[in-house]
Each structure stands twice: as structure tokens, then as C-alpha cells.
């Protein structure tokens, strides 16, 4: 039986293609790779679920445990605990429910900042963000050679990307060249921001020494769904997260204190009814550190850097990072349903950075003399409840990560309906890890249901141990800086055994049944070319994990096994190990590059660079997907199987190159127009008997909603 299903792509408009092509010089030359926008661990884990689909396309399994659901005739609001099976990156800090886990309670909008924040309006750069400057590129000659030669403006010419994930809806939105908010999502959604509705960061109210340099941020965004329900993000002071440079340069303190995430605060049902209200508490600061090394060399005359006939050679080894001001969900309430869900949390004792890591930053940035900026941020106890209660903590101990201890469901008279408690491995020598989840009945002292979890026994190293592969997963191999010419890329190769470190391997359910998970590294049969125009035939392994087998056993001992093969042209008689991988690697790791060109003054130059971080982001998309699979086989215990086929680079969904650039020579920083949003969609799902006879097929077709950029 064949079923044809038609679906629609919602898409970005021409602005994405426009901005991708505005290259006025060779961007980023002479700089270390820029640290991306760093949200809190909770916002990052929430965003991971919205951006990296749990699907065969990415090799990830759906692992979800229901906690509670608020239901009425207008809205269904589930609270669930979910796990992401893609692997544990070494420098990604666990969220408040432990490594790999995420508490799906409401949702958030998280910003991917492109160059400058859209709302930038600071004394040194007044009204310079894209919110104010979008009209600069609303012109017909934006891609002319003359404009390509203009020096980089101090005004922003590229919008930030805002990703969202809430209650089963996910996508992105951004501001276009006419000042309209454009949405990219599989659901028909509308984004509203009220002009002029800005909020000065919270620290300005409490004696912050650099308040004059703060830029007001977007106060709130409203997303409206097809039914007319309104979802409000931000709006209140304690529902917006911020980050700042942990060690700003002299004279720039406070200038980079920007909003990174806006959390869901209210749901207003269409047609009336009481809103669902989310309340938050601002937690103590947390940090995210990184180490980068680079070598750069310039020869010839480059007007903006060198005098005629000069050359430059620079080596840089740097430790830096971000200080983040997170918020934590306190409660969800809905008067119409007489329900309130309370979230109780406390400081964890988990592994974090060493004092020596922070001292190294202080030594490099301040000469080891002062750490005044951190003191200013952290010695404002009126701002953060935890600091009011623990005001005498040592400076670096004031970076504190919370863990969720308990979820209690009560009625509006505080009578308990359900309680869920979380049990962790919580020690200073390991990352926070969820051991068990227990449900209690009202007034009960013993759990009525318990889920327990077991993980791969390989240990993860300390933070900043520099034992990661190309993609940031564990490979237990140091890559010393002096090896950069000979074998740096080989030293960064993935290791399947170490990539599996502390990955979830077993769930035991309250019924006594179990699920066991097996994994292997990603594989690929082709690579997207650096200019994004074509595919290059090349095989290999990429890091991160894909599920290879799931074995589920019930309390009676009955077992169901599912195996997954990420290959092309599978048949029952074929050995999957001999078949070609259907995986496409988004970006090949690259640590060196050289380029020759003409500067804006007409003089020639040669430029080369080595970086300990890849000079091209891995991957070249906002979701972080390194490999996507065009075809995946799911084989069951009885030999029957299903083949899933997906949209990908190789079947009509390539990215497109820039319209124009100055110096038409490839450099890693050249942007492109992304069709990432259109990849990973089902094309065909076909079920077969164990002998290979088809029994059912579903075929999907898609159409763009609006006008795709062309």
C-alpha cells in the first residue's frame, strides 16, 4: 500500500541570500576563531533538542520520560525529561538534570549573534545594531563591486538568528532588510516585537560600575501559532539570560553584556481563558572557558595591517571565555486547571573549572594584578538570591551550577498531587549525572515508580584538558602545538571507544523492563565542498554517536531488537558492512589555510593561518549536525525492516554560494545561503518483509511557503 503525503517548507526570504553575499574584505583574517554566543547549560540543552532532530537522519533515538501534563480543551502542556543520544562534548557543561538530559518544561528563544547584537545602542556605538541599520542593505546595488570594496562598517549589516524550541514547535526567525520579522519553521508561526520595547540589563539597578556602557535589550517576543495561541518570551527581568566576556579588554567592561536567551513566561489561549504562567529565579553566575592557539603570517602590502614591503608573523595562545547569568524555572501555574508545578533546585558539587584556569585568564588579560571585573559582577548581592545567602564565598567559587532536586505538582491550595525526585552522581571529580528518577504519591515516603540509568564506564577528562577530537568529543589524545605542521589533523581523529564516554547505555523501567542502547561513530560517503557548491566523494568516520542497536526487554523476559544501518541499497542478502554509507559530512576539518589577494587599496598580499580550533565551524549550520543520512535501515528481530529516505545535499537541497565577494578566492569565513532547514525531512518510508517484499510505502512531497531566496 502506498500513501502520498504532501507537506510544506516554511522558509526564509531573500534577506538570507543578501546578507550571505556582503563580503567587504577578507573577514576574520589575523583573528582566532570567534567564540560563538554562549547560552547557559539549560538553554543550550533545550536548544539542542529543537535544532538537532531526534530522528534516523541524525542517528539519534527518542528517549523521553513523562513527568506531568497540564491538559484542558484549549492547550496541552507536557512536562517531560528527555535524553540526547548524540554524545558528550568535552567542553559542554551539563544542564540542571545532568549530562545529556534536558527538562522540557516550556521553552526558550536563544540568540545566535552575528557580529553585533541586533539591538546594539551603546554610547560608543549608538544605534549600530541591525534593528536600526537594516535599511542600509535595502538597496538594489548591495552586491556591486563598488560596495564590495568599501571598508567594513562599524554599523551592523547582518541580522542575528533567533532559534526557538517550545512545546513541540521549533525553528528560527530574524529581522529582514525592511524591518520585518521572518520565520523559518515547519509550523505556520508569527513573531511579534513591539517597536521600542527594550529593557536595560538587570545589573544597571544595583550599582553596576559600567552601567553607562550597557545596551538595552529586546524585552520580549511573542510567537503566535495557527490557532491564535500567544506564547510570550522574556518580558520579566528574571526570564532573560545574559552573557559577557569573562575578561574584557581595558576600557570595554560592560560593553558586551548582552542578552542570549528569552524564556517562555506566559501562554495566552486563543478565545480566552486563564493564561499559563511561568516564573523564574536568577541563579548565580556560571562560566564557559576555552583555549585557542593560532599562528598567522602576512606578506606583502595589506593596507589595513601592514606598511608597504613589510611582513608579519604572530603566535597566540589564549585562554578566555564567557561569564553567564542563567535563570531557573521556579513554577508553572494554570488557575483554570487548579494546578501549580513547582521546581526545587540547589547548588551542585559537580566538576567544574580549576582556580588555575581562571588565574591563567587573569594573568594573560590583567597581568595577574587584578580581577576587578569579576568582583564587580559578583559582588552585587541584591541581584541574585543565592549570593544574598552565601555572600562570603571565594571569587571563583561564586560560579555555581544548580541541579534540579524535585518537581512537585499541587493544586492552588498547595495540596500535593505528585512529586518527582532526582538522584544524581554529584561529586567534584565528575560531571553531574542522573542516576535515577522516582515518583511519589501524595504523602508517600517510598517511591511508587523509579527509572534508573546506567552509563558507559569510560571516564571523561577534566574541562580544558585538550583531549578532544575535531568535533569536541573525547579521543584521549593531546595535540601539542608544535605538531601543527606534521600530524595535527591525525591527532584530532575521533575514537569510538572514547567518544562513548559516559553515554547512556541502559534504562530500567518501573515495570522491571529494560532498554539497552549500542552506538558507533558516524560514517560518511561524501563531503560538502568548502564552497558549498558540490559533493566530494570521500569516505571516513566523524565523531558524535549514532544509535546502532536498541534492545528492549519486558518484565517477562520477552526481547525486541532494532538494528540501524546507515547505508544505501540495502537488501536482506547484503552485508551492511560492505554497503556504501549514505552519510554526508557537512564540513571537513581544516586547521591551515592560505590565501592571496588584492586589498581594498589595490595592493597584493599573501596570508596564511594555523589554528588549534578548526578555521571552519564544524558543522557549517546552526544545528551543529556533522553528518546527515539520506537513507537509513531499521531492521527488527524477525528480519523485517523499514528503509527511511530523507532530503539531503545529494537530492536537491544543497546550499548556495554568495552572489559576489571581494577577492573571489576561497577563505573559511565566506558565508553562504543555507538550505539546512529543508534537509532531514522524510522523502519516503518503505516497510519490507524479512525476504525483501514491500508491504507499505509512504511518500512525501514538499512546497515552500513564501518565496525561497533565489
Where are these regions (language model features)?
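N-terminal secretory signal peptides that target proteins for export/translocation
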Residues: 1-11
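Sec-dependent signal peptide recognition
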Residues: 10-18
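Cleavable N-terminal signal peptides
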Residues: 18, 28-29
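N-terminal, Lys/Arg-enriched amphipathic/low-complexity engagement segments
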Residues: 38-44, 169, 183, 188-194, ...
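Non-catalytic interaction/targeting regions
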Residues: 68-70, 88, 98, 177, ...
Amino acid at each position: 500500500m502506498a500513501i502520498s503525503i504532501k507537506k510544506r517548507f516554511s522558509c526564509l526570504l531573500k534577506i538570507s541570500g543578501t546578507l550571505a553575499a556582503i563580503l567587504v574584505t577578507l573577514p576574520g583574517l589575523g583573528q582566532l576563531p570567534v567564540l560563538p554566543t554562549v547560552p547557559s547549560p539549560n538553554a543550550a540543552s533545550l536548544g539542542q533538542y529543537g535544532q538537532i532532530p531526534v530522528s534516523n537522519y541524525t542517528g539519534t533515538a527518542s528517549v523521553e520520560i513523562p513527568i506531568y501534563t497540564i491538559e484542558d480543551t484549549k492547550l496541552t502542556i507536557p512536562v517531560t525529561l528527555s535524553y540526547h543520544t548524540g554524545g558528550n562534548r568535552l567542553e559542554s557543561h551539563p544542564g540542571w538534570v545532568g549530562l545529556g538530559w534536558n527538562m522540557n518544561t516550556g521553552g526558550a528563544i536563544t540568540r545566535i549573534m552575528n557580529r553585533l547584537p541586533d539591538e546594539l545602542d551603546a554610547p560608543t556605538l549608538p544605534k549600530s545594531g541591525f534593528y536600526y541599520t537594516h535599511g542600509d542593505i535595502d538597496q538594489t546595488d548591495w552586491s556591486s563591486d563598488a560596495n564590495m570594496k568599501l571598508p567594513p562598517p562599524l554599523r551592523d549589516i547582518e541580522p542575528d538568528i533567533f532559534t526557538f524550541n517550545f512545546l513541540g514547535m521549533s525553528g528560527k526567525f530574524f529581522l529582514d532588510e525592511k524591518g520585518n520579522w521572518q520565520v523559518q519553521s515547519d509550523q505556520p508561526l508569527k513573531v511579534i516585537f513591539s517597536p521600542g520595547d527594550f529593557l536595560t540589563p538587570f545589573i544597571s539597578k544595583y550599582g553596576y560600575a559600567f552601567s553607562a556602557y550597557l545596551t538595552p535589550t529586546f524585552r520580549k517576543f511573542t510567537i503566535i501559532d495557527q490557532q491564535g495561541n500567544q506564547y510570550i518570551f522574556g518580558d520579566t527581568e528574571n526570564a532573560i539570560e545574559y552573557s559577557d566576556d569573562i575578561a574584557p579588554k581595558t576600557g570595554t567592561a560592560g560593553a558586551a553584556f548582552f542578552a542570549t536567551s528569552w524564556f517562555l513566561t506566559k501562554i495566552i489561549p486563543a478565545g480566552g481563558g486563564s493564561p499559563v504562567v511561568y516564573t523564574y529565579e536568577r541563579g548565580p553566575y556560571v562560566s564557559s572557558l576555552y583555549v585557542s592557539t593560532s599562528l598567522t603570517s602576512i606578506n606583502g602590502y595589506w593596507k589595513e595591517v601592514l606598511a608597504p614591503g613589510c611582513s608579519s608573523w604572530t603566535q597566540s595562545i589564549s585562554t578566555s571565555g564567557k561569564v553567564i547569568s542563567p535563570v531557573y524555572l521556579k513554577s508553572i501555574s494554570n488557575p483554570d486547571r487548579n494546578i501549580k508545578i513547582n521546581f526545587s533546585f540547589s547548588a551542585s558539587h559537580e566538576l567544574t573549572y580549576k582556580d588555575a584556569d581562571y588565574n591563567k585568564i587573569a594573568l594573560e588579560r590583567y597581568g595577574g594584578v587584578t580581577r576587578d571585573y569579576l568582583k564587580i559582577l559578583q559582588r552585587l548581592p541584591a541581584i541574585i538570591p543565592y549570593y544574598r545567602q552565601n555572600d562570603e564565598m571565594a571569587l571563583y567559587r561564586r560560579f555555581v551550577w544548580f541541579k534540579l532536586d524535585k518537581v512537585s505538582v499541587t493544586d492552588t491550595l498547595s495540596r500535593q498531587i505528585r512529586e518527582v525526585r532526582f538522584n544524581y552522581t554529584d561529586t567534584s571529580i565528575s560531571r553531574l549525572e542522573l542516576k535515577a528518577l522516582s515518583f511519589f504519591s501524595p504523602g508517600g515516603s517510598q517511591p511508587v515508580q523509579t527509572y534508573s540509568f546506567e552509563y558507559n564506564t569510560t571516564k571523561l577528562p577534566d574541562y580544558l584538558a585538550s583531549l578532544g577530537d575535531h568535533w569536541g568529543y573525547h579521543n584521549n589524545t593531546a595535540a601539542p602545538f608544535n605538531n601543527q605542521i606534521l600530524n595535527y589533523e591525525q591527532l584530532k581523529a575521533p575514537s569510538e571507544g572514547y567518544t562513548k564516554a559516559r553515554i547512556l547505555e541502559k534504562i530500567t523501567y518501573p515495570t522491571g523492563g529494560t532498554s539497552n542502547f549500542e552506538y558507533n561513530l558516524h560514517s560518511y560517503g561524501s563531503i560538502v565542498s568548502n564552497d558549498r557548491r558540490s559533493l566530494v566523494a570521500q569516505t571516513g568516520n566523524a565523531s558524535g554517536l549514532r544509535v546502532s542497536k536498541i534492545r528492549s526487554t519486558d518484565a517477562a523476559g520477552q526481547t525486541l531488537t532494532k538494528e540501524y544501518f546507515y547505508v544505501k541499497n540495502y537488501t536482506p542478502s547484503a552485508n551492511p558492512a560492505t554497503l556504501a554509507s549514505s552519510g554526508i559530512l557537512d564540513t571537513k576539518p581544516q586547521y591551515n589555510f592560505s590565501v592571496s589577494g588584492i586589498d581594498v587599496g589595490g595592493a597584493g598580499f599573501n596570508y596564511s593561518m594555523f589554528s588549534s580550533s578548526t578555521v571552519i565551524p564544524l558543522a557549517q549550520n546552526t544545528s551543529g549536525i556533522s553528518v546527515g543520512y539520506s537513507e537509513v535501515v531499521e531492521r527488527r528481530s524477525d528480519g523485517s525492516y523499514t528503509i527511511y529516505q530523507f532530503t539531503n545535499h545529494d537530492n536537491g537541497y544543497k546550499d548556495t554560494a554568495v552572489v559576489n565577494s571581494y577577492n573571489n578566492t576561497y577563505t573559511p569565513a565566506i558565508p553562504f545561503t543555507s538550505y539546512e532547514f529543508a534537509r532531514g525531512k522524510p522523502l519516503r518510508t518503505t516497510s519490507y518483509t524479512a525476504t525483501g517484499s514491500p508491504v507499505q510505502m509512504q511518500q512525501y512531497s514538499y512546497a515552500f511557503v513564501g518565496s525561497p531566496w533565489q
